[in-house]
Structure formats: C-alpha cells, structure tokens
Amino acid sequence: MNLMNPQPPADFSQEEAQRYSRNALLDQVGWEGQAGLRAGKVLVVGAGGLGSAALLYLAAAGVGHLGVVDGDAVELSNLQRQILYRTHDLGRRKVASATEPLASLNPHCRVETFDLRLDPGNVREVVQGFEVVLDASDNFPTRFLLAECCWQNQVPLVSAAATGWHGQLLVALPGSGNPCYRCLVPQAPPEKAVPPSAQAGILGAVA
C-alpha cells in the first residue's frame, strides 16, 4: 500500500485494500468514496454492447450490488462488441451468462438478474431499491418508460446510446429545476431516421 494513501477502513480486507488501491489514490474517491461504491446499488438495463462494458467496469470499480436487466439470448453477431460473452455462451440467456465473468472479475460484487423486458407492469418493481439506473437499452419505448419511472421515483438516470461511429450520453438528475429525459428528447425520431438496432452497423469500440 502506498504510504501516501490513507489506510482503508477496518472493514476492508487486505485483498480489498489492494484491489481498490488505485481508486482510493484519487482525491475525488479516497476510501470514503470506495466505501460508498461498495454500498452502492446500480441497475443496468440492457446487457448488450454498452451494458457489457459498463457492467465490467462497475464491478471492477467495486460497486457492491449490480442489477442486470435483459430479455435476450446471446447471438453470434453480439460477440463483436458485447464483451461480457464468449463463443460458448451462444444461445444462453444473457443475464445468466453475464453473472459468471462479473463474479470472476470481482467476487465481492453481488449480481441480481432480471431475465425480462421492461413494461409498465414491472418497471417500478425492478427499479425500486436501486440508487442509480444506467439505461443501455436499444429502443425508445424502453428509454421513455424507464425515464418516466426514474423521474417519478427520484432515481438518477444515466442514459446511453451508440450506433455507427457515434455515442450519446445523457444524465437526468431528479430535482427542482433540472430537465428530465423527455424535456430533451420529447419524442422518438421517425422510424426511417433510425434503423432498428439489429439492422444498424456499429463499431465495437464505440460501445
């Protein structure tokens, strides 16, 4: 451990102290921030290209509780950018396949899975209990549904999208005077303007 770095709290094991030592060296994080990450609960909706990368980095960073929502199975065309999965995962449910690499990367991270598609009947039940939601879904109905639920329940929302050579990121923090997702994206673009995700090209590294 670097002598310039304050000692970790007593409830951090020696293994955890070494694992997260580079995080703790950052003034904006420190051991207090690392303890906050360990207590954190983040829901990731969509375990595709964006969700795969986000889940790996969140687990590596030490977020203690990750939720994963996805209702699809792993397909061969996914492997070009969805780095959570391997060839032997083909045909398996994504949420089941995702738990293994995340647990292997960081066994201190609890992973909760939801093998489903969000709809008005289940979205609130899924979101409740999480402190931050990352929307990495690939369609506007899900984005709008999730944005409304997060706004109504005062849950910060990070919404991300990627296609072709481009990526987009939007953060909606519920609170007086702050804009919501629908304030900035009031309606979905015309269908002809945005091809379905399965028909759109994307460079894997963009995700």
Task: Label each PLM-derived region with a short phrase.
Residues 1-207:
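Adenine nucleotide-associated cytosolic modules
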